[in-house]
Amino acid sequence: IPMTIFGPDDLTLIKEGPSNRRTYIDELLIRTHPKHLKQRTDLESVLKQRNAFLKQQKGYLSNENQNTLTVWSEQFATLSKQWGTVRQETLGEIQDLAQQAYENLVGGTEKLEIIYDPQWLHEGLLPLLKEAEKDEVRRGTTLIGPHRDDIEIYLDGMPARTHASQGEQRTIALSLRVAG
């Protein structure tokens, strides 16, 4: 019997930062499309290795290490584009389900929107990584990509995190659980 569990921690989907929403959509994506698990694992591996390389530079990137960073950046950009695309597709699949669940729960006509539209997915990640390279080397971490994205949730055009009441936030979180 399929079952949906809803608990107090589910409010973090709405109230807390973007990492909770990324985790929710990524877990949903892998649960509904298990074929993408390897893609996610590959992305995490390349990100981990790229970050380790950036940390090793200790704030300075020599010319000889520039080529290595370029290779990591190219791999990361390719895998990120694939992951960002399947994230968008998955959110497209659950948008209507979440809206319907919300309407069924409240009996109203408020519009629930789930938006994932990272700038890098349209412009290409590689040029943005190149632009952020000095800062990334200085900080020793990757600053742009799917690991930093947010999935925004709106109720009637207003950010649910800041403008929805606590009851509305609970209903939105429940709608997302039911949709997934």
Q: How should these model regions be labeled?
A:
Residues K38, D42, Q56-Q66:
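Short, flexible active-site-proximal loops enriched in glycine and acidic residues
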